[in-house]
Amino acid sequence: MTVTNTPTPTFDQLTRYIRVRSEPEAKFVEFDFAIGHPELFVELVLPQDAFVKFCQHNRVVAMDEAMAKAVDDDMVKWRFGDVGRRLPKDPG
């Protein structure tokens, strides 16, 4: 068995993700921001210009459709139980 020591990335090396929730022409940009793990995010709101600067400063990566779906599925699972189930299982 070979053991490899993979260095853990520092905080500054972690990927920063965004997912825009607002419409493109909205005055304020509503978006999710995550560091390292797309499923652990905060919801933020910034004016358009500030959002652009925020993204440049943080060197963000936009979540693709597959990432967004995985995050949404995970949210449903935690909120309602099994993925896709919105009601408790019938005991009888």
Swiss-Prot record:
One of its GO terms (molecular function) is phenol 2-monooxygenase activity. Pathway: Aromatic compound metabolism; phenol degradation. It holds the Pfam family Phenol_hyd_sub. Disruption phenotype: Cells lacking this gene cannot grow on phenol. The keyword Iron does not apply. GO terms for biological process: phenol-containing compound catabolic process. The keyword Transport does not apply. Keywords: Aromatic hydrocarbons catabolism, Plasmid. It comes from the Bacteria. InterPro entries: DmpK (IPR010353). DmpK is an auxiliary protein associated with the multicomponent phenol hydroxylase DmpLMNOP and it may be involved in the post-translational incorporation of iron into the oxygenase component of the phenol hydroxylase. Required for growth on phenol but not for in vitro phenol hydroxylase activity. Homotrimer or homotetramer. Interacts with the phenol hydroxylase components DmpL (P1 component) and DmpN (P3 component). This is Phenol 2-monooxygenase, auxiliary component DmpK. The lineage of its organism: Bacteria, Pseudomonadati, Pseudomonadota. The gene is dmpK.
